[in-house]
A protein has these predicted regions:
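A signal for specific C-terminal beta-sheet/loop modules enriched in small/flexible residues
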Residues: 8-11, 20
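N-terminal signal peptide c-region/cleavage motif recognized by signal peptidases
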Residues: 14-16
Length: 137
C-alpha cells in the first residue's frame, strides 16, 4: 500500500513537467510542419529560456509586446548566451492550445515569415495565456 501511495505521489509530481515538455515539443513540431522545403528548426535550451522568461514577464505585466522593460528579443536572447545577428520572435496571447496559436501566427504574414524564415534554431515559452517563440540563425 505504501509503495502504491509513493508511486502515485511521484507520478503526480512528474505529470506537469512531462505535460510541459510534450507541449513544447508539440509546438516545435507544428513549426517544422509549416517549413516545407526548409530545414527543420532545432530546439535550443538557451532560446527556450529566453522565450519562457519573456512569456512569464508578459503574463506578469498583463500585456503582450516584443519590448518590455526597454529590452527586445535580441537583448533577451543575448542574456542567455546567444549573441548574434538574426533573431526573430513571435508572441501571442489568449490562445489555449498550440494548434490555436499556430493558426493565428500562420494567418499573419509577418509571423508566418518568421516561421518560414532562414532560422535554424527555436525556443518556446508559455505562461498564463501568453506565448513566445524565439528564432535564431
Amino acid at each position: 500500500m505504501m509503495q502504491r501511495l509513493f508511486l502515485a505521489v511521484v507520478l503526480c509530481l512528474l505529470a506537469p513537467s512531462l505535460a510541459f515538455a510534450q507541449w513544447q515539443d508539440n509546438l516545435v513540431q507544428h513549426h517544422n510542419a509549416q517549413r516545407v522545403g526548409l530545414p527543420a528548426l532545432v530546439r535550443d535550451a538557451r532560446l527556450d529560456r529566453a522565450a519562457q522568461l519573456h512569456a512569464e514577464n508578459m503574463a506578469r505585466q498583463g500585456r503582450m509586446s516584443h519590448v518590455l522593460d526597454g529590452r527586445g528579443p535580441g537583448a533577451r536572447v543575448c542574456d542567455q548566451g546567444v549573441c548574434r545577428i538574426g533573431v526573430g520572435e513571435n508572441v501571442a496571447m489568449g490562445q489555449r492550445t498550440t494548434g490555436e496559436v499556430m493558426r493565428a501566427w500562420m494567418a499573419s504574414p509577418v509571423h508566418k515569415a518568421n516561421i518560414q524564415g532562414r532560422y535554424s534554431r527555436i525556443g518556446v515559452g508559455y505562461s498564463s495565456g501568453f506565448w513566445c517563440v524565439v528564432f535564431a540563425k
